Amino acid sequence: VVLNVETLYNIWSALQGQPVTDTFVTVCGEVKQPATLRLAVGTSIVDALAAAGGVTCENPAIIHGGPVMGSLVESAEAPVTKTTKGLVALPMDHPHVRRMRRPVSVSLERAITACCQCRQCSDLCPRALLGHNIAPHKIMRAAGYALTKDPAVWTAAFLCSECGVCDTFACGADLSPRQVYRSVKAQLAAAGVKNPHKATPTPLEELVYRRVPTERLIWRMGLEPYVMGAPLVREVLLPAVVKVPLKQNAGAVSVPVVKVGERVSRGQLVAEPPPDALGARHHASVTGTVTAVGNEVSIEREA
């Protein structure tokens, strides 16, 4: 089991009876003062960017998470959750943003026209190197031409961790096996197909020789201008309004236990999982008054 520092900190806090009300988030990219901020859960992305000095380009794209495995946010008004660890602002015309916004239909068309089956994506795939039965070049062939009757080629989508090595580093034709796998995985899940791959893998000998150099990855993604320090700001940012989402984790959507107009204290329970369901409790990250209850619990902080 691998635990990051913040997870260990939250475990220690739980042992002291303290719930998770804050999260440490690195805000970087097109911002004036890149920083690692301690944000109250439910802080809007707009407030987080403002705390880093504001954005330095017009109408930026915001990546929630890291640049490789993160996702584009639909609205900068969206709240920070317990699992938010990074916010990366990039120009809307940045090559990596264009890659992330590319529809899967385009990826499929490109698979037909541009994939030369060089298998570079499969040679560098971390999951394949760990011994899993996955070969990204085969899904490109199958999706593009439907030339396989082997169900394992399709169910290998369950083995894809969507790490992004294939499309951000390996492929010289700017194709995205990851996006194709993501689409296949969603279709299999919608059809009720379960992951059939249960074998314990044996890592390949080539694993130690095929690791991706961080510097080269940054260069390939065009992120060199944004490589700089993001110093930790220890003080908690408590905005005027927070919106605590009722679903921030795997499992069921939590049920609110507070009502509009109710006064809550920082750390007070505001939502919990339904009975006999897997989920997580959520707590007020500021002291104030509940102003709305829906998919989120909105709290206006006391002055």
Sequence positions of predicted segments:
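Short histidine-centered loop motifs in beta-beta connectors
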Residues: 254-263, 267
